[in-house]
From Swiss-Prot:
Main function: High affinity, high specificity proton-dependent sulfate transporter, which mediates sulfate uptake. Provides the sulfur source for the cysteine synthesis pathway.
Transmembrane segments: 29-49, 73-93, 149-169, 212-232
Organism placement in taxonomy: Bacteria, Pseudomonadati, Pseudomonadota, Gammaproteobacteria, Pasteurellales
InterPro entries hit by this protein: CysZ_sulfate_transptr, Sulfate_CysZ
Entry keywords, A to Z: Amino-acid biosynthesis, Cell inner membrane, Cell membrane, Cysteine biosynthesis, Membrane, Sulfate transport, Transmembrane, Transmembrane helix, Transport
Protein name: Sulfate transporter CysZ
GN (gene name): cysZ
Pfam families found in the cross-reference section: EI24
GO function terms (MF aspect): high-affinity sulfate:proton symporter activity
Length: 267
C-alpha cells in the first residue's frame, strides 16, 4: 500500500528542485546539464519523428483481427510504449554524458542545504573520479536494460502487450527515474548501489511519485530542457532529509559513507 504522505513528499521534493536551481550559488553548475540536455533532446526528437510510424506499425500488426474494434485504444498504449522506449534511451545517454556534472551539482546542493564543507580537490582529482562515476551509470544500465527488453518484447503479445504492459513499463520507468537521480548524492558518499536501491524501496511511494513527476516533465516541451538539474537538486534534498543521517550511522563498505568523493572544480 502506497503511503499518501510519501506521495505528497515526492511532489514537495520535485518542486524544491525547481526552487534550488534558481539559487545564486547553484546557477553556474546547472548550465552544463541544460546544454547537454538540449543537444540530446534535439537528436532524439529527430529520431523519434523519423521512426515512430514504423514502430507503431510493428506493434499494431501484433493485434489479432478479433480485437480490431479496440484499435484506437490500443494505438494509444502502443504510442505510450514507444515514448517510454525513447525516454529510456535519453536518460541512459544523458546519465553517461552528464554524470560528472550531475555529481558535482548534487555535491553543491548538499553543501548549501547542510552548511557543511564537503571534501574538495583539484581538477585532476575530479578527472580521476570520472571512471567510478561512469561505472555507476553502467550498474544502472545493467539493472534496468534486461527488464525493459523483456517488457518491450511482451508488448508484442496480443492484449497483454497493449493493456497491462504499458502500465508496468510506466511504473518501472518512474522507479528508474528515482534511482537515476537519487543515486548522485548516494554515490557522492560511496553508498553501494544495492544499498541505495534498498533504501529507495523502503520509501517506495516517495520514490515513485518523485520519479513519476520527473518522467512526466520529460515529455513537456521546454520544461524537459531543465528537468535533469531540477531532478538532481530535488533528489539531493530528499537524500539530506531522509537518508543522509541514517546511512552515516552505519558502515556500508570499507571506504565508509562519510567522505564525499565528488570534488569541486570551482569554489
Amino acid at each position: 500500500m502506497l503511503s499518501h504522505a510519501e506521495l505528497k513528499q515526492g511532489f514537495h521534493y520535485f518542486m524544491m528542485g525547481w526552487h534550488l536551481i534558481t539559487q545564486k550559488g547553484l546557477r553556474r553548475f546547472v548550465i552544463m546539464p541544460i546544454l547537454l540536455n538540449i543537444v540530446l533532446l534535439s537528436g532524439l526528437f529527430w529520431l523519434f519523428i523519423t521512426q515512430i510510424e514504423k514502430m507503431i506499425g510493428m506493434l499494431m500488426l501484433s493485434i489479432p483481427d478479433w480485437l480490431s474494434w479496440l484499435s484506437s485504444i490500443l494505438l494509444i498504449f502502443a504510442i505510450l510504449m514507444i515514448l517510454v522506449l525513447f525516454y529510456f534511451v535519453f536518460t541512459t545517454l544523458s546519465g553517461f554524458i552528464a554524470a560528472p556534472f550531475n555529481g558535482l551539482l548534487a555535491e553543491k546542493v548538499e553543501k548549501m542545504l547542510t552548511g557543511e564543507n564537503l571534501v574538495e580537490g583539484s581538477v585532476w582529482d575530479f578527472m580521476k573520479d570520472i571512471p567510478r562515476m561512469l561505472g555507476r551509470e553502467w550498474q544502472k544500465l545493467v539493472y534496468s536494460l534486461p527488464k525493459l527488453i523483456i517488457l518491450f518484447l511482451l508488448g508484442f503479445v496480443p492484449v497483454l502487450g497493449q493493456s497491462v504492459i504499458p502500465i508496468i513499463v510506466t511504473l518501472f520507468t518512474a522507479w528508474m527515474m528515482a534511482i537515476q537521480y537519487c543515486d548522485y548524492p548516494f554515490d557522492n558518499h560511496k553508498v553501494p548501489f544495492f544499498v541505495m536501491k534498498a533504501e529507495l524501496a523502503e520509501k517506495r511511494a516517495l520514490s515513485l511519485s518523485f520519479g513519476g513527476l520527473v518522467m512526466l516533465c520529460t515529455f513537456i516541451p521546454l520544461v524537459n530542457l531543465v528537468v535533469i538539474p531540477v531532478a538532481v537538486c530535488g533528489a539531493t534534498a530528499m537524500w539530506v532529509t531522509h537518508f543522509r543521517d541514517h546511512l552515516a550511522m552505519k558502515p556500508l563498505n570499507q571506504e565508509g559513507v562519510s567522505r564525499v568523493s565528488t570534488v569541486s572544480i570551482v569554489k
